[in-house]
From Swiss-Prot:
Originating organism: Clostridium kluyveri (strain ATCC 8527 / DSM 555 / NBRC 12016 / NCIMB 10680 / K1)
Lipidated residue numbers (S-diacylglycerol cysteine): 23
Residue numbers with lipid attached (N-palmitoyl cysteine): 23
Function: Plays a major role in protein secretion by helping the post-translocational extracellular folding of several secreted proteins.
The protein, known as: Foldase protein PrsA
Superkingdom, taxonomy of origin: Bacteria
Membrane topology label: Lipid-anchor
């Protein structure tokens, strides 16, 4: 059965409260939990239901169930993971609420008729691509994930409204952005390695240890002539590469999959060189640059439009983020974190 965007029903966790007049414990019903307030933004409530029905929460619960099983609520690590992640999701919902309120004030809300039309079009595409236009299969999949067609459409419409509201607000905020030729030239001169005829590459190996002292001892052994691959197999704590002598294969200069500090240390090496200890979020590395492949840089004229688009996007994102933070600071926001789970 197809999974609809990895959606799943969020299990409601029972919450107990003490009455103010005595020690009688009252267990909230699922309906009461769903209606409980998790945050208020300028007087508008965000309910537990809003939080639990958010696709990010649904995906979170699906992943937790896969890792910890159906009885995940009995596992302290699982509960802590859910709480931490739901706090982040709630922050996003608060931001969305602030943006929606400001959009209403600025008359930037999307047209509801168009929204509903877009929703129907996208759901129809979903049915066609994933269920061969079979309504029965589609509804069975919805039911398995805890949705009726009506509740799924309501969730979908809400997400689409948030997306289109942000798009309209972004367009309004960033409409006067200009990128000068000097900005383009400066960016090009600073980032020439991004604009080569082919991606610049380096063949790397590394040895990972926990402490700087361990890394210094490893470096001394290498400086004294010991074989890099042999030492890596002996002491490296990177289980994915140690059996290959620490070999990481070919890595592009702009590879974002590696720790930024690790990449900075690697890029600073000449071919054949071995680094001093490099600290990253994983520990301390001794990095060896086995080989470098560098290619000619494209002319500015060939990449000018590409750079302009990049700078416009960067400026737009920065400006919108700054403006939203201003709106949030000017808002009255309260969170009731005890109601999150």
């Amino acid at each position: 059965m197809k999974n609809i965007g990895r959606l799943a029903v969020t299990a409601l966790i029972a919450v107990f409260i003490f009455s103010v007049t005595g020690c009688n414990m009252i267990e909230k019903t699922p309906e009461a939990i769903a209606k409980s307030t998790v945050a208020e933004v300028n007087g508008e409530k965000i309910t537990r239901s809003d939080l639990d029905k958010d696709p990010n929460t649904i995906q979170l619960i699906t992943q937790v169930k896969q890792q910890y099983g159906e009885n995940y609520k009995e596992n302290e690590d699982a509960v802590n993971t859910i709480k931490t992640q739901k706090e982040q999701i709630l922050d996003d919902l608060i931001t969305n609420k602030v943006v929606a309120q400001k959009a209403k004030e600025l008359k930037l809300l999307p047209d509801e008729t168009k929204l509903k039309s877009d929703m129907e079009t996208q759901i129809a595409q979903l049915k066609k691509q994933n269920f061969n236009d079979d309504a029965e299969q589609f509804n069975t999949a919805l039911k398995a994930q805890g949705f009726t067609e009506e509740s799924f459409k309501a969730m979908f419409l809400s997400q689409l409204r948030t997306q289109q509201t942000l798009e309209k607000v972004t367009e309004s905020i960033s409409k006067n952005i200009k990128i000068t030729d000097k900005e383009i030239e400066d960016y090009y001169n600073t980032n020439k390695s991004k604009y080569t005829e082919q991606p610049n590459k380096m063949h790397l190996a590394h040895i990972l240890v926990k402490t700087e002292d361990e890394a210094k001892k490893v470096k001394k052994r290498l400086d004294d002539g010991e074989d890099f691959a042999k030492v890596a197999k002996e002491v490296s704590q990177d289980t994915a590469s140690k059996d290959n002598g620490g070999d990481l294969g070919t890595v592009n200069y702009d590879n974002s999959g590696y720790d930024a500090d690790f990449m900075a240390g690697a890029l600073a090496l000449k071919e054949g060189a071995i680094s001093a200890p490099v600290k990253s979020s994983f520990g301390y590395h001794i990095i060896k640059c086995i080989k470098k492949e560098e290619y000619p840089v494209k002319a500015l004229s060939a990449v000018k439009d590409q750079i302009k688009t990049q700078l416009e996007s960067d400026k737009k994102n920065s400006l919108v983020s700054q403006k939203i933070q201003e709106w949030k600071k000017a808002s009255t926001i309260t969170k009731k974190e005890k109601n999150i789970i």
